[in-house]
Design a protein with these regions (language model features):
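Short, high-confidence coil segments that cap the C-terminus of an alpha-helix
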Residues: 81, 138-140
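Alpha-helical substrate-recognition element adjacent to the catalytic core
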Residues: 4, 10-120
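Acidic, divalent-metal-coordinating active-site segment for phosphoryl/phosphodiester hydrolysis
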Residues: 125, 130, 146-157
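Short loop/turn elements that form and flank the Walker-type P-loop nucleotide-binding site
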Residues: 23, 137-138
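Short, structured coil segments at secondary-structure junctions
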Residues: 106-107, 156-158
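Donor nucleotide-activated moiety binding/catalytic core segment of transferases
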Residues: 121-137
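Surface-exposed amphipathic alpha-helices with a cationic face
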Residues: 73-77, 134, 155
């Protein structure tokens, strides 16, 4: 079944979406930190040395939504696409992650988090997540992520 692809235009500083073409439903990945969630207020915990990852993650309860990206996720879901959350957050932060998604009306089909003791780079962790997604029947074709290295990894594994 084909679903409409979306075009974004901006008028009076407000985004507006319109249907332009029909496309098959897609599996679409969204990152959390820096993509759906504004982490500006807690970035300092990991930009200085030593990095304080515990404080960084504990402060996620104060994250603000990135409204434009959330709107895209909502519209894509409404158009029939499957939304997959792939985050570098450790699994122990599953509850606040799901709460953020719920509080911001982000419907999703699956959530993938890193293991609690997995300290590998995001590119490695998310590549492994991609293999798990495919094992679970997903075939992501689009990804929204704020890190260039992760975006490049998604491209290389297309």
């Amino acid at each position: 079944m084909a679903t409409p692809a979306l075009r974004l235009s901006v008028s009076n500083n407000r985004p507006r979406f319109t249907s332009i073409i029909e496309s098959d439903p897609k599996d679409i990945i969204f990152d959390m930190d820096g993509t759906l969630a504004d982490i500006t207020h807690r970035r300092h915990y990991v930009e200085s040395k030593p990095k304080n990852w515990d404080a960084f993650y504990r402060a996620m309860i104060n994250d603000k939504p990135v409204e434009a990206v959330i709107m895209v996720a909502q519209l894509l879901k409404t158009a029939g696409h499957r939304i997959i959350i792939a985050t570098g957050r450790p699994r122990r932060y599953n509850i606040p992650t799901l709460r953020f998604l719920q509080d911001n009306d982000i419907s999703y089909d699956a959530v993938y988090l890193r293991g609690d003791t997995d300290y590998r780079p995001d590119t490695v962790v998310k590549e492994q997540m991609l293999h798990k997604m495919r094992d679970n029947g997903y075939n992501p074709t689009i990804a929204f992520d704020d890190r260039k290295s992760v975006v490049e990894m998604w491209r290389l594994n297309d």
